[in-house]
């Protein structure tokens, strides 16, 4: 049984980890931390977990206690894992970080986008970017895994087949993405209030979103060179979900793009390439650890439109983190994640 610790268990990604791990036959949550809620039982804060964690309570983060775990998940704001990851790694504990702390390979680039110096630049070289569809082999032997963000997951999975095949004009990519309000986290903010977000949709961070350098970094690796990407995120009046509409111009219109995507993801348990002409819906992935993709070439021209949908809290965060844990410990990566999405 894998002994699990969770740092930052009161946010949406934290409770989603708890929900998923409650169904996992090979993992046991031994420690969950929260400075503000120390002493409170988990099922008192989250009644959906009643009957699953009858004795588990939040505690103040303690390196010695966390270091006794086999793996520790960080479901925290950026900057927190910087301070603790090194000590946990020294204790022999593996770290899976759901925050942005170790996603970017360049400490100066991270500081530019996150507004503070990187707190553990010495760990960046060994951090493995936890996108299993790209880095599965590296994940198997990692000590420190950086779980991709939600927008980066949906966008990269949608564009990687085109870039790997050298078919897309890498200098003119567009990602037009929509997110549910849970992507903003559980902290109170005016923009997340029901009366503000309901019955409305808006673009934000058009000048530059923090996920932009992460997406570019991954697409550069797939393309084998620089990419030009316009990324525009939008907030939509739904709780969960990412819908990415991705645009790329192809250099060879004779290629069967449906076959290309089907072959690229044929052995990926959590990527569903839908039949030609499909339009994936966010509701079809709600609560599930799956990315559904459809590829279109309108009017048979050189412009390709890829539609990619995920649940931002599952494949875009906690589900992908559990998928990484499964790979890391040599388990079937579908373990605890094979449930169907919720409909309606």
Swiss-Prot record:
Reactions that this protein is recorded to catalyse: N-acetyl-L-glutamate 5-semialdehyde + phosphate + NADP(+) = N-acetyl-L-glutamyl 5-phosphate + NADPH + H(+)
Gene3D superfamilies in alphabetical order: Dihydrodipicolinate Reductase, domain 2, NAD(P)-binding Rossmann-like Domain
Source superkingdom: Bacteria
Pathway this chain belongs to: Amino-acid biosynthesis; L-arginine biosynthesis; N(2)-acetyl-L-ornithine from L-glutamate: step 3/4
SMART domains (UniProt xref): Semialdhyde_dh
GO molecular function: N-acetyl-gamma-glutamyl-phosphate reductase activity; NAD binding; NADP+ binding
One annotated Gene Ontology cellular component of this protein: cytoplasm
EC code(s) of this entry: 1.2.1.38
Annotated keywords: Amino-acid biosynthesis, Arginine biosynthesis, Cytoplasm, NADP, Oxidoreductase
Active-site residues from the entry: 150
GO biological process assignments: L-arginine biosynthetic process
Subcellular location: Cytoplasm
Enzyme class: oxidoreductase
Family listed: Belongs to the NAGSA dehydrogenase family. Type 1 subfamily.
Known role: Catalyzes the NADPH-dependent reduction of N-acetyl-5-glutamyl phosphate to yield N-acetyl-L-glutamate 5-semialdehyde.
Stated name of the protein: N-acetyl-gamma-glutamyl-phosphate reductase
Species of provenance: Ectopseudomonas mendocina (strain ymp)
């Amino acid at each position: 049984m894998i002994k699990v610790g969770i740092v930052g268990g009161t946010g949406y990604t934290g409770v989603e980890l708890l929900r998923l791990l409650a169904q996992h036959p090979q993992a046991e949550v031994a420690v969950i931390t929260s400075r503000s809620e120390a002493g409170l039982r988990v099922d008192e804060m989250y009644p959906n977990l009643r009957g699953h964690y009858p004795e588990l309570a939040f505690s103040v983060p303690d390196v010695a206690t966390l270091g006794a775990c086999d793996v520790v998940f960080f479901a925290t704001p950026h900057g927190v894992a910087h301070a603790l990851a090194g000590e946990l790694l020294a204790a022999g504990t593996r770290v899976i970080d759901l925050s942005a702390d170790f996603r970017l390979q360049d400490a100066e680039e991270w500081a530019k986008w996150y507004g503070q110096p990187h707190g553990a630049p010495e760990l960046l070289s060994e951090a493995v970017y936890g996108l299993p569809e790209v880095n599965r082999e590296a994940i198997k032997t990692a000590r420190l895994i950086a779980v991709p963000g939600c927008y980066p997951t949906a966008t990269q999975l949608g564009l990687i087949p085109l870039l790997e095949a050298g078919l897309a004009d890498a200098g003119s990519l567009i990602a037009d993405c929509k997110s549910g309000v849970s992507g903003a986290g559980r902290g109170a903010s005016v923009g997340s209030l029901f009366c503000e977000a309901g019955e409305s949709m808006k673009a934000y961070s058009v000048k530059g979103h923090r996920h932009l350098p992460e997406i570019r970094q991954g697409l550069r690796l797939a393309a084998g060179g620089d990419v030009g990407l316009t990324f525009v995120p939008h907030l939509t009046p739904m709780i969960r979900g990412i819908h990415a509409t991705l645009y790329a111009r192809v250099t060879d219109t004779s290629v069967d793009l449906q076959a290309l995507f089907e072959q690229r993801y044929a052995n990926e348990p959590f990527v569903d390439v839908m039949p030609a002409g499909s339009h994936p819906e966010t509701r079809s992935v709600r609560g599930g650890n799956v990315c559904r993709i459809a590829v279109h070439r309108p009017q048979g021209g050189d412009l390709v439109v890829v539609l990619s949908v995920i649940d931002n809290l599952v494949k875009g965060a906690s589900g992908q983190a559990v998928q990484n844990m499964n790979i890391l410990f040599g388990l079937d990566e579908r373990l605890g994640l094979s449930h169907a999405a919720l409909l309606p």
